[in-house]
Swiss-Prot record:
Recorded family membership: Belongs to the RAB6IP1 family.
Keyword tRNA processing: no
Keyword annotations: Disease variant, Epilepsy, Golgi apparatus, Guanine-nucleotide releasing factor, Membrane, Phosphoprotein, Repeat
GO MF annotations in UniProt: guanyl-nucleotide exchange factor activity; small GTPase binding
Record localization: Golgi apparatus membrane
Chain positions with Phosphothreonine modification: T1079
Principal cellular location given in the protein's record: Golgi
PROSITE patterns reported in the protein's UniProt record: DENN (PS50211), PLAT (PS50095), RUN (PS50826)
Organism in which the protein naturally occurs: Homo sapiens (Human)
Function: Guanine nucleotide exchange factor (GEF) which may activate RAB6A and RAB39A and/or RAB39B. Promotes the exchange of GDP to GTP, converting inactive GDP-bound Rab proteins into their active GTP-bound form. Involved in the negative regulation of neurite outgrowth.
Protein name per Swiss-Prot or TrEMBL: DENN domain-containing protein 5A
Gene name linked to the record: DENND5A
Length: 1287
């Protein structure tokens, strides 16, 4: 940008950098606003493609039918002073666009023409910000050419309108018979008319200050006094140039912790800047946000911002958009919004609502269209805030902020103390008048929350109408606190004699602001008081870490979450995944000592340190008890001291070196200023030298550049360059050079950003998931929790929604992904109906598989449409967004997400119809890479559908495989089956005779754990040899195999009529996706081999003592690991107890070792030995032969458990009874006692050989020590294992 003479000085030490005037250029005349023209072009192109514009018009084609007074015309930057300053190059496009976001506006004397003030922000590509403050007012148009042009436009418009809206002849006759009442449209036309002979035409003009810091109240006062000077009948004491020159060149920027007083046209202006150990500068009224939205809505919006949802603010007041946006981001301290931030979205950037990235933007409303007529490209993850109507729309599945009720209560108390109802007030003037009536002396600090002494506003009266506050009342009453008025004694140490130099209302705004901000800051200080403990410092040098930081894990999230109270987890697990938290931790790692620290981080860390010193919270002592803010009083006093004792008073405005006659102006018109005196500052600056301390400039300069000065030049340049690169990709839209090629380039950067995000997200999910599975296999340490995994999957769903929303032609429903799926479903149905879609290949393939083996379950077809139907049949899911997320979860669990999406996008005609050319889904290379990244999820097992939708009905298919070789077909009894899972179990279900397959429906059982199968022993041949049972979830396709290999029948095997089978999930075949679940070959199931025809223990595999010890050790180790996992990540304990390598099987091997061989073909089981031992000990007790009390207690417990198991009505057989005894012994921590008891029992000598493990005291003592490690765990048994026994 070309620049003229600099404004003097080489550092941003001045209060203001530029004074700007925008408005109508009478030399170029009336020009249609090209920004609005671009917007109309975009909307017209959407209309041609069958889409509706972003904002639906009240009448079709309104953009072309608007009266000339309602159209927008091109505004220009008419003047700026100085021309340029080196530290803040002037961005003409951005300033012009944001001063008058919709261009020029014309009005007549019949229209309201009140001046309107608004602030704005210009965010540069490197992330730095410049602040603007604009006052828009109306001036009478004196140019005859402009008035004539407007009159001509009206003639043309009326002629077009009459032609377009002329009624048919019949309608004309009908209308002539009516009373001649004007239609609403006609009334509107007349109201908006302009007649050059009788109307006065006014046009908008804007004066603006561009400043390095956001002193909003001071800048507003400067502009309003300047405007008052030109509208007042009496001229100001000095020419306007004197006041503008003074604020540009002679008013310094106050350094941290200082206050400043300078002169406006009519009165003094005061501003103060917080010190480096206070909360950062914030000069917008928090009061207005709570009045407009209410506490509940503010908290919901605050939560959405913290979780980085897309946020769209909507209001017809630019200043409201800015105030809400700035307030929400200020309340985030110490975190900072990292994404697109455009509180006032110019008309030319409406296409940016299509951005598939988190954003916080403000959209101007014309005051006529309601929410239903506002069409937005994507709404699945959108928080929509209609500020003017006190209304907010939230995304689904929004978690609650920790301790929300107590937090809301604390904020509500402060608001009530200032006369602001917590539920908000649509008529803000009422609340403002209450606040104005309060005397400053009534604002008495109570060291906690600034309650008002003797306030006439009864808290109950203020709150009784609000539902949210009603819940708070109940909470407060439970804690014993009354909601009645409290008498607050005045603090004798308060500074009641302290006289501040600003008016009372301004002081109250300062006080309310700091109280609310301190409470919010205190919440984060409490929640993250020990965050430093979990920061993972990099092992490599800073340069290497910075290069690879996106791939580095820099915060121990799992450990941090494991220490948090349970109610905090849904919010915190998602918050830890945000960019703002990642940047916060990056800052912490980059800054090793206080000198290096970012100013915001330094303030936060000092507060954390203070909390620790006060023993409020320590890293080793965590509590979920809500702790109120205690820093309000100190923060208030700091502000009051600065306002009472002004640190510096700038020099007063004075006459400049102007020619005689210059500086005159006509009242009501902002004059053309003398550029020769305003373009440069004073050469010697004698005024500044005389009045402003030189150290101000030096100190301020050092504070602003401290982080850059501490880096060497190469590092600084590198970091700045990267910041610019990131900003130019997806962080911030550039507000200039808005040509179609630039828009296309912006969209291309969005595509690249989406692909990069997809790559990083899939990698993160795989690393975390595979890390956890490695732990289950005994490698590494656990690093993920169930909540965290669920958060990552929810984040993936959000990403998919943003991808499917990018470049949409027609927005239908809140979920773009589900809308696309529905279109695909309709297309397939139509093709199937017309016969154009062949299904022969699928059917033949299925038939061929059915004929492979008779023992196969019917193949489960892989079908995108079928999975959609599963979701559509779930009544609990009501919304399109919920259905899309459920479908994604189901596809991930079935390892079909990439395949399904590839199939969805294979319909190229549909994709072209739904999406514009620049959309991500129409970029072939990026789309292929995206699908490839998703394919990597097939390497891990997710249960993200099963574990989330726990209450839905699931169809299950059962296949029972009996032994054909041993007469299974002659079975005459009536079998039954009962299936158990982690979430519940079925009732006993009768199986029709000779039926081996059946399907049933029940509530989701979760991961299946056991099957109980048995029969009633009826008929001539009531003996059944079952090889295995298979159960398949018909929605997820998960198939579980439950090996048996045992007889069910009296006189067969161990005489059992029922078995408890423990199953495991079968792994899918990786080589062919469509392959249905097959039963693995028999030789792959050792349990089936070992137990298929186990008539006597001699036939079982022989293990030596070392192998037995190893198997018991592994079984116990598996149980120990189970209890060291987070509770939600613990798998099936039943599998660890009764599974193939479980504790029961290992102890069975121990008792079988050295067991004497049976004679005369008599079957002998371990249970026979245990029953004899029971008889022996009962005999001893009857004979009162008691060696010792401890021994007596153990023997009595053993006999009681064996007797109870023998008396159970279940026919579970001798091996089943042994399994039950081991499970009960593990539950009650008695196993090691029983092992010692049985080792000393004389029965052991008769039934075991000398080499038996149980007769080797060394091995027995080793076994006892291993089993003792289970004593510290609370083992809960599945119902199926202990059914029928009450002990």
């Amino acid at each position: 940008m070309s620049g003229g003479g600099g404004g003097g000085g080489s550092a941003p030490s001045r209060f203001a950098d530029y004074f700007v005037i925008c408005g109508l250029d009478t030399e170029t005349g009336l020009e249609p606003d090209e920004l609005s023209a671009l917007c109309q072009y975009i909307q017209a192109s959407k209309a041609r493609d069958g889409a509706s514009p972003f904002i639906s018009s009240t009448t079709e084609g309104e953009n072309f039918e608007q009266t000339p007074l309602r159209r927008t015309f091109k505004s220009k930057v008419l003047a700026r002073y100085p021309e340029n300053v080196e530290w803040n190059p002037f961005d003409q496009d951005a300033v012009g666009m944001l001063c008058m976001p919709k261009g020029l506006a014309f009005k007549t004397q019949a229209d309201p023409r009140e001046p309107q003030f608004h602030a704005f922000i210009i965010t540069r590509e490197d992330g730095s910000r410049t602040f603007g403050f604009a006052l828009t007012f109306y001036e009478e148009v004196t140019s005859k050419q402009i008035c004539s042009a407007m009159q001509t436009l009206y003639h043309m418009h009326n002629a077009e309108y009459d032609v377009l809206h002329a009624p048919p002849a019949d309608d004309r006759d009908q209308s002539s018979m009516e009373d001649g009442e004007d239609t609403p449209v006609t009334k509107l036309q007349r109201f908006n008319s302009y007649d050059i002979s009788r109307d006065t035409l006014y046009v908008s003009k804007c004066i603006c200050l561009i400043t390095p810091m956001s002193f909003m109240k001071a800048c507003r006062s400067v502009l309003e006094q300047l405007h008052q000077a030109v509208t007042s009948p009496q001229p100001p004491p000095l020419p306007l140039e004197s006041y503008i020159y003074n604020v540009l060149y002679e008013v310094p920027l106050p350094p941290p912790g200082r206050s400043l007083k300078f002169s406006g046209v009519y009165g003094p202006i005061i501003c103060q800047r917080p010190s480096t150990n206070e909360l950062p500068l914030f000069d917008f009224p928090v009061k207005e946000v709570f009045e407009l939205l209410g506490v509940e809505n503010v908290f919901q919006l605050f939560t959405c911002a913290l979780l980085e949802f897309q946020i769209l603010l909507y209001s017809q007041h630019y200043q409201r958009l800015m105030t809400v946006a700035e307030t929400i981001t200020a309340l985030m301290f110490p975190f900072q919004w990292q994404h697109v931030y455009v509180p006032i979205l110019p008309a030319s950037l409406l296409h940016f609502l299509d951005a598939p990235v988190p954003y916080l933007m403000g959209l101007h409303s014309n005051g006529l269209d309601d929410r239903s007529k506002l069409e937005l490209p994507q709404e699945a993850n959108l928080c929509f805030v209609d500020i003017d109507n006190h209304f907010i729309e939230l995304p689904e599945d929004l978690p609650q902020f920790p301790n929300k009720l107590e937090f809301v209560q604390e904020v509500s108390e402060i608001l009530m103390a200032f006369g602001i109802p917590p539920e908000g007030n649509l008529h803000c003037s009422e609340s403002a008048s209450k606040l104005k009536r309060l005397r400053a002396s009534e604002l008495v600090s109570d060291k906690r929350n600034g309650n008002i002494a003797g306030s006439p506003l009864h808290s109950y009266e203020l709150l009784k109408e609000n539902e949210t506050i009603a819940r708070l009342q109940a909470l407060v009453k439970r804690t014993g606190v009354s909601l009645e008025k409290l008498e607050v004694r005045e603090d004798p140490s308060s500074n009641k004699d302290l006289k501040v130099q600003c008016d009372e209302e301004e002081l109250r705004i300062y006080q309310l602001n700091i109280q609310i901000r301190e409470v919010f800051a205190n919440r984060f200080t409490q929640m993250f008081a020990d965050y430093e403990v979990f920061v993972i410092q990099p092992s490599q040098d800073k340069e290497s870490w910075f290069t690879n930081r996106e791939q580095m894990q820099n915060f121990d999230k799992a450990s941090f979450l494991s220490d948090q109270p349970e109610p905090y987890l849904p919010f915190l697990s998602r918050f830890l995944e945000t960019q703002m938290f990642a940047s916060f931790i990056d800052n912490k790692i980059m800054c090793h000592d206080d000198d290096d620290k970012d100013p915001v981080l330094r303030v936060f860390d000092s507060r954390v340190d203070k909390i620790r010193l006060l023993n409020v919270r320590t890293p080793t002592l965590r509590t979920s008890m809500y702790q109120k803010c205690t820093t309000v009083d100190e923060a208030e006093k700091a502000i009051e001291l600065r306002l009472a004792k002004i640190d510096h008073t700038a020099i007063h405005p004075h006459l400049l070196d102007m020619k005689i006659g210059q500086g005159k102006y006509e009242p009501g018109f902002f004059p053309k200023l003398q550029s020769d005196v305003l373009s440069t500052g004073p050469a010697s600056n004698k005024w500044t030298k005389r009045n402003a301390p030189a150290q101000w400039r030096r100190k301020d300069r050092q504070k602003q550049h401290t982080e850059h000065l501490r880096l060497d030049n190469d590092q600084r340049e590198k970091y700045i360059q990267e910041a610019r690169t990131m900003g130019s990709t997806i962080r911030q839209p550039k507000l200039s050079n808005l040509s179609p090629s630039v828009i296309a380039q912006t969209n291309w950067k969005f595509v690249e950003g989406l692909l990069k995000e997809c790559r990083n997200k899939t990698k993160r999910m795989l690393v975390e998931k595979m890390g956890r599975e490695a732990v289950e296999l005994g490698h590494g340490e656990v690093n993920i929790t169930g909540v965290e995994e669920n958060t990552l999957i929810a984040s993936l769903c959000d990403l998919l929604e943003r991808i499917w929303s990018h470049g949409l032609q027609v927005k239908q429903g809140k979920s773009a992904l589900w809308s696309h799926l529905l279109h695909y479903q309709d297309n397939r149905q139509r093709k199937l109906t017309s016969g154009s879609l062949s299904t022969s290949g699928i059917l033949l393939d299925s038939e061929r598989r059915k004929s492979d083996a008779s023992s196969l379950m019917p193949p489960l077809r892989i079908s995108l449409i079928q999975d959609m139907r599963h979701i559509q049949n779930i009544g609990e899911i009501k919304t399109d967004v919920g259905k899309a997320r459920a479908w994604v979860r189901l596809s991930m669990e079935k390892k079909l997400l990439s395949r399904h999406l590839k199939q969805l996008l294979s319909d190229h005609e549909l994709t072209k119809k739904l999406y514009k050319r620049y959309a991500f889904l129409r970029c072939d290379d990026e789309k292929e890479q995206f699908l490839y990244h998703l394919l990597s999820f097939n390497a891990v097992d997710y249960f993200c559908f099963t574990n989330v939708f726990t209450t839905i009905l699931i169809p299950y298919h059962i296949l029972i495989v009996p032994s054909k070789k041993l007469g299974g077909s002659m079975f005459t009894a009536n079998p039954w089956i009962c299936i158990s899972g982690e979430l519940g179990e079925t009732q006993i279900m009768q199986i029709p005779r000779n039926v081996l397959e059946m399907t049933f429906e029940c509530q989701n059982l979760g991961k299946l754990t056991t099957v109980q199968i048995g029969h009633d022993n009826s008929g001539l041949y009531a003996k059944w040899l079952v090889e295995y049972v298979m159960v398949r979830n018909e929605i997820t396709g998960h198939t579980y195999k439950f090996p048996c290999g045992r007889w069910l029948g009296k006189g067969m095997d161990d005489g059992s009529l029922e078995r408890i089978l423990v199953g495991e999930l079968l792994t899918s075949q990786p080589e062919v996706d469509e392959r249905p679940c097959r039963t693995p070959p028999l030789q792959q199931s050792p349990s089936v081999i070992r137990r298929l025809v186990t008539i006597s223990p001699n036939n079982k595999p022989k293990l030596n003592t070392g192998q037995i010890q190893e198997s018991i050790g592994e079984a116990v180790n598996g149980i120990v690991k189970h209890f060291h996992k987070p509770e939600k990540e613990r798998g099936s304990l039943t599998l660890l107890l009764c599974g193939e390598c479980g504790l029961v099987s290992a102890l069975e091997q121990a008792f079988q070792h050295g067991f004497k061989s049976p004679r005369l073909f008599k079957n002998v089981f371990i249970w026979d030995f245990l029953e004899k031992a029971q008889t022996y000990y009962e005999t001893l007790e009857k004979n009162e032969v008691v060696p010792e009390e401890n021994w007596h207690t153990r023997a009595r417990n053993f006999c009681r458990f064996v007797t109870a198991i023998n008396n159970t009505p279940r026919n579970i057989g001798k091996d089943g009874k042994f399994q039950m005894l081991v499970c009960l012994g593990a539950r009650d921590h008695l196993l090691h006692h029983w092992i010692a008891l049985l080792a000393d029992c004389p029965i052991t000598a008769h039934m075991y050989e000398d080499v038996a493990l149980i007769k080797d005291h060394t091995l027995v003592n080793s076994l006892i020590r291993v089993l003792q490690t289970l004593q510290e765990f609370n083992i809960t048994l599945e119902t199926s294992l202990v059914k029928g026994i009450d002990i």
